Amino acid sequence: LKMNHEISWGRGDIASKIYGFYENKIQQKLKDINNPILIDIGAADGFFAIGSLKSKICEFCYAFEETKKSRENLSKTAKINNVQNKLSIIGKVTKDNFFTLLPSKINFSEVTILCDIEGGEFDFFSDEILATIRYSNIIIEIHKNHNKNLEIDLLERVKKYFDVSIIIDNDKNFESVSELHALNDIDRNLICSEGRSYIGKWWHLSPK
């Protein structure tokens, strides 16, 4: 993946992305699932959308991103990596317009959905949405919320249709990155830092 110099989201985690540490368990999960279609909800600057196309993890990606600057960066980065013809960049998505923004004949059994919408997941994944995408693999970043019932309620909804496994991304393996071996612990960990205020948590939903 060739990265665009113009970054609108997460400038502090560039080193982590360059060395392959950034959300590396999610990278591996996408590779393991290996569905031909990726729907990236909250695509930001396109690390996963374009990275998955460039590495041939998927064949086509629908990237939803509400921020205009990020959509512009997505387009530029897609051209830099020569995958612009395999990418559809779409604006803000809600539970009400989601299906209208996708091809009507999309086969959701061939789809992986990756969702990172800063807490909006608790509202977006309604029972109607989940029932329609029940044959997809879904990876949702679960954000902290003061109302614990939101996470409990979402878990109850998804368990109707999916088996749920929890991914905690809190370990980075430096073994294969020899240029980091001589650094002290602080500098080495700063390089792989994603700047989080708490350990990241995702749910992987696999069809029952």
Residue spans for each PLM region:
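Conserved Class I S-adenosyl-L-methionine
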Residues: 155-168
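Active-site segment flanking the S-adenosylmethionine/decSAM binding pocket
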Residues: 37, 41-45, 88-152
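Active-site phosphate/pyrophosphate- and oxyanion-stabilizing loops and adjacent acidic/basic residues
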Residues: 28, 152, 156
